[in-house]
């Protein structure tokens, strides 16, 4: 990795026409991050105050820039930062467009110019992620800029965010329509995995795991744990805050009109059924193992889906707004068939059987027929795992598919409100970028097939502020779960020798240090309510 060059510049980016650009001040508050390191017997956490350009300590490939400068090169950090800011500014303008001058007040003879009630601030800071290819690979280094974009909401605490965005689908006419008061349906999609790879003993998307010497397939223990993992807690927190910023902006800006802002949570279960079935087909586990695995996954699905839903609603209501949150169920026909065959008949249905019931049974059948019609034959799923992965893309696209199949009025209809292009916002970890890319590609085919029905897909990917220390690859709590007992060597408020302040903490303690005591207390209450606290361990349904 090359050293980070320090720059001191003045901000020239004005995100809103009614907000004057201000120079960067040396007094702006620092950013705190936590770094988790795994050791032989116990993981540890250290906290770092980022108040200058620097590498994030012990986190390979990650750095922090306090003042971004445009270096004049197309792929420079400054250029990438500017593109992220421009993308989020477009999304912000769609959700809460600059209000036109109001009519002249008959009493005061004055005209009031109103701006967005949610103020967007470009802090000219960023996290930089540089992923180097594996040894002997010809792939390029992939750099991602997560720009710091803070939101000041009319009520409630401000939101400090580091985001990467994709908004190239937003056209000038979309912004023009928003400024003229054209309303549009808004759907925010997000997702979360279950457990962690450490608890599962495998990576769900990779399939069968093998031993270290690659001589035998690993059969993981059944996931009986009832305690929320660090990954689940941190993901709920990060996604909830980003979604709250978008939902509050849209609510106060009025861009959704009388329609509720809908948040759809894609919490997998079909994806987690695949692994034990592959073990069963390999003759490594019994039917009883598979049945118990299904039961435990179903329980975790209910708990984590409710935890994420409640966390989002809490963060939105802290800012005096509301939102409709639904858990997706687009694969319900397939999961019901799978459960019937496996639990009732001890048979594994074929992938063609699964595709048939998705296309012809249940409330989502028309959407699935529309979806599969735009999927190339070579991309159609050949096994259960590839079908489960395809379902992620379906769920992101579902609001558009539903509009096509139910013949919802288009912008040219005569509904009670004029309607712009439906806005689909994917809020997810940057590791899920492939879902966005594939949905974006399929939506272009969808537009051609639907004679102009043109949903507007954008992506918002929040960076974590709790990092894992790895030799290579992306920092991720799912793959590198530090466990529930972590040695804290340097609390943010401490001074002097870190050994004097050593103690054992849990995930919620670390989340509280980074995101605040209110977030920590809320999560503690919610995990107790949902049976995900340490006190619930070993208590089975």
Curated annotation (Swiss-Prot):
Motif segment (Conserved DDXXE motif): 428-432
Catalytic activity, reaction form: L-tryptophyl-tRNA(Trp) + L-arginyl-tRNA(Arg) = cyclo(L-arginyl-L-tryptophyl) + tRNA(Trp) + tRNA(Arg) + H(+)
Keywords: Ligase
Keyword Ligase tagged: yes
E.C. number: 6.3.2.-
EC supergroup of this enzyme: ligase
Phenotype upon changing residue 428 to A: Leads to complete loss of cyclodipeptide formation
Superkingdom, natural source: Eukaryota
Outcome of substituting residue 193 to A/S/T: Leads to complete loss of cyclodipeptide formation
Gene Ontology molecular functions: ligase activity
Pathway(s) where this gene product acts: Secondary metabolite biosynthesis
Lipid biosynthesis keyword on record: no
Consequence the record notes for mutating residue 392 to A/F: Leads to complete loss of cyclodipeptide formation
Its job: Arginine-containing cyclodipeptide synthase; part of the cluster that mediates the biosynthesis of a highly modified cyclo-arginine-tryptophan dipeptide (cRW). Within the pathway, avaA acts as the scaffold-generating enzyme and is responsible for formation of the cyclo-Arg-Trp diketopiperazine (cRW) from L-arginyl-tRNA(Arg) + L-tryptophanyl-tRNA(Trp). AvaB then acts as a multifunctional flavoenzyme that is responsible for generating the cyclo-Arg-formylkynurenine DKP, which can be deformylated by avaC. AvaB then catalyzes an additional N-oxidation followed by cyclization and dehydration.
Entry domain remark: The conserved DDXXE motif is essential for catalytic activity.
Protein name listed in UniProt: Arginine-containing cyclodipeptide synthase avaA
Organism field: Aspergillus versicolor
The encoding gene: avaA
């Amino acid at each position: 990795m090359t050293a980070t060059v320090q720059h001191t510049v003045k901000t020239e980016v004005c995100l809103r026409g009614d907000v004057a650009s201000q120079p960067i001040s040396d007094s702006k508050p620092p950013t705190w991050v936590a770094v988790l390191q795994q050791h032989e017997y116990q993981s540890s956490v250290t906290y770092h105050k980022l108040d200058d350009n620097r590498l994030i300590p012990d986190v390979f490939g990650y750095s922090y820039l306090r003042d971004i400068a445009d270096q004049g090169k197309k792929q420079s950090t400054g250029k990438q930062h500017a593109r992220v800011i421009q993308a989020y500014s477009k999304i912000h303008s769609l959700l809460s467009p600059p209000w036109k001058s109001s009519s002249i007040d008959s009493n005061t003879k004055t005209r009031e110019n109103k701006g967005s009630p949610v103020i967007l601030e470009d802090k000219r800071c960023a996290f930089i992620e540089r992923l180097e290819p594996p040894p002997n690979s010809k792939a390029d280094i992939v750099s991602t800029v997560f720009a710091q974009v803070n939101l000041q909401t009319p009520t409630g605490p401000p939101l400090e965010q580091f985001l990467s965005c994709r908004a190239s689908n937003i056209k000038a006419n979309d912004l023009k329509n928003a400024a003229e008061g054209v309303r549009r349906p808004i759907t925010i999609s997000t997702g979360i995995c279950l457990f962690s790879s450490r608890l599962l003993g495998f990576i769900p998307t990779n399939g069968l795991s093998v031993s270290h010497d690659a001589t035998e397939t690993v059969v993981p223990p059944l996931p009986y744990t009832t305690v929320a993992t660090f990954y689940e807690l941190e993901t709920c927190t990060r996604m909830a805050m980003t979604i709250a910023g978008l939902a509050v902006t849209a609510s106060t800006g009025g861009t959704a009109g009388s329609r509720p802002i809908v948040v759809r949570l894609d919490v997998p279960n079909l994806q987690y059924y695949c692994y034990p079935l592959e073990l069963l087909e390999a003759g490594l586990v019994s039917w009883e193992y598979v049945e118990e695995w299904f039961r435990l996954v179903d329980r975790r699905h209910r708990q984590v889906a409710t935890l994420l839903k409640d966390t989002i609603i809490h963060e939105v209501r802290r800012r005096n707004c509301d939102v409709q949150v639904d858990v997706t169920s687009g694969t319900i026909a397939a999961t019901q068939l799978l459960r019937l065959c496996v639990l009732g008949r001890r048979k594994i249905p074929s992938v063609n059987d699964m595709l048939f019931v998705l296309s012809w049974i249940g409330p989502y059948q028309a959407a699935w027929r529309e979806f599969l019609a735009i999927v190339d034959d070579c991309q159609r799923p050949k096994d259960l795992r590839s079908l489960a992965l395809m379902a992620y893309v379906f769920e992101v696209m579902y609001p558009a598919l539903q509009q096509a199949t139910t013949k919802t009025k288009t912008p040219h209809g005569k509904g009670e409100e004029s309607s712009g292009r439906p806005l689909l916002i994917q809020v997810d970890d940057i590791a899920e970028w492939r879902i966005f890319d594939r949905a974006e590609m399929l939506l272009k085919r969808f537009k051609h097939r639907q004679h102009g029905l043109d949903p507007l897909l954008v992506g918002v990917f929040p960076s974590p502020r709790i990092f894992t220390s790895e030799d290579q690859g992306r920092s991720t709590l799912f793959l590198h779960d530090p466990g529930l007992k972590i040695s804290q060597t340097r609390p943010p408020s401490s001074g002097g020798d870190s050994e004097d302040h050593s103690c054992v903490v849990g995930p919620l303690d670390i989340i509280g240090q980074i995101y605040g005591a209110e977030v920590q207390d809320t999560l503690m209450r919610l995990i107790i309510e949902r049976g995900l606290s340490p006190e619930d361990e070993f208590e089975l349904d």
